[in-house]
A protein has these predicted regions:
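A short helix->loop->beta-strand "cap" motif at the edges of active sites that frequently abuts
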Residues: 3-5, 63, 122-124, 147-151, ...
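Short, acidic/turn-prone active-site loops that include or flank metal/cofactor-
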Residues: 11-15, 71, 87, 156-158, ...
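Rossmann-like adenosine-cofactor binding region
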Residues: 73-165
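Phosphate/diphosphate ligand-binding glycine-rich loop within oxidoreductases
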Residues: 1-35
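Residues that form or flank phosphate/diphosphate-binding pockets in enzymes
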Residues: 17, 53, 135-138
Length: 178
């Protein structure tokens, strides 16, 4: 203000673009990997502006959709949410759409760590378009190498712009934080 520069906050302004990115990635999986999306369960971690649109995309593609959003569940008390453990057990694709919180009761920093990946039951595809630090890079790379997940679609990277090139060369789709 002192410098005469105006600014504004525009939460959710890119949510449609992120939803289009995820939809395109899902369709690319279907085309190149031969998966039938309508037979899969999509788990959405973080159901705000972006996650809500992803839920709609999943439903339009005929997918079963499970949603996880602990802050919203605590605030709204909705029974429409599933636990992270339920998503780990039931989902074929897990997509992250959470803000980055390094501390607190809703901490998302390294939410997907070695323990998380070892809890997965269905060898899912992992999608991250939220914040790079939500997924621990070494844990993701180990999960790929150990067959705990079948593939990864990554648009946001831990330590951007100095990303892990081994991980970049291992993912199904890697993009530069579009």
């Amino acid at each position: 203000r002192e410098a005469g520069i105006a600014w504004t906050n525009a939460p959710g302004c890119n949510s449609a673009s992120v939803a289009q990115y995820v939809q395109s990635a899902l369709l690319l999986l279907q085309q190149l990997k031969g998966v039938q999306l309508s037979e899969l369960t999509l788990g959405i971690i973080g159901v705000g502006n972006v996650g809500s649109k992803i839920a709609q995309v999943g439903q339009e593609l005929g997918m079963r959709v499970l949603k996880n959003d602990l802050p919203r569940q605590d605030k709204e008390g909705e029974s429409d949410f599933s636990s992270l453990q339920a998503l780990a057990a039931e989902c074929d694709i897990l997509t992250f759409h959470v803000p980055l919180y390094k501390e607190g009761s809703y901490k998302t920093f390294h939410l997907a760590d070695h323990t998380f990946f070892r809890s997965l039951k269905r060898c899912p595809v992992i999608i991250n378009t939220s914040r790079g630090e939500v997924i621990e890079t070494n844990a993701l790379l180990n999960a790929l190498e150990d067959g705990l997940i079948s593939d990864a679609i990554i648009d946001v990277w831990e330590n951007e712009p100095d990303i892990n090139l081994t991980l970049l060369n291992r993912v199904f789709l890697g993009t530069p934080h579009i």
